[in-house]
């Protein structure tokens, strides 16, 4: 899935 700018941070967990 596309995370966008969240991909840059480790906050993205999907």
UniProtKB/Swiss-Prot annotation:
Top-level taxon in the UniProt lineage: Eukaryota
Organism of origin: Conus caracteristicus (Characteristic cone)
GO molecular function: toxin activity
Miscellaneous comment as given in the Swiss-Prot or TrEMBL entry: Negative results: does not modulate oxytocin (OXTR), vasopressin (AVPR1A and AVPR1B), NMDA (GRIN1 and GRIN2A), muscarinic (CHRM1 and CHRM3), and nicotinic acetylcholine receptors (alpha-7, and alpha-3-beta-4), and voltage-gated calcium (Cav) and sodium channels (Nav).
Tissues and organs where the protein is expressed, per its UniProt entry: Expressed by the venom duct.
Compartment(s): Secreted
Disulphide connectivity of cysteines: 3-7
Keyword annotations from UniProtKB, A to Z: Amidation, Disulfide bond, Secreted, Toxin
One Gene Ontology term, aspect cellular component: extracellular region
Annotated protein name in UniProt: Conotoxin Cca1669
Coiled-coil residues: none
Modified residues (Glycine amide): 14
Entry keyword annotation includes Transmembrane helix: no
PTM summary: Amidation at Gly-14 does not impact activity, since a non-amidated synthetic peptide shows the same absence of activity than the natural amidated peptide.
Annotated function: Probable toxin.
Domain notes: The cysteine framework is C-C.
């Amino acid at each position: 899935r596309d995370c966008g700018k969240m991909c840059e941070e480790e906050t993205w967990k999907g």
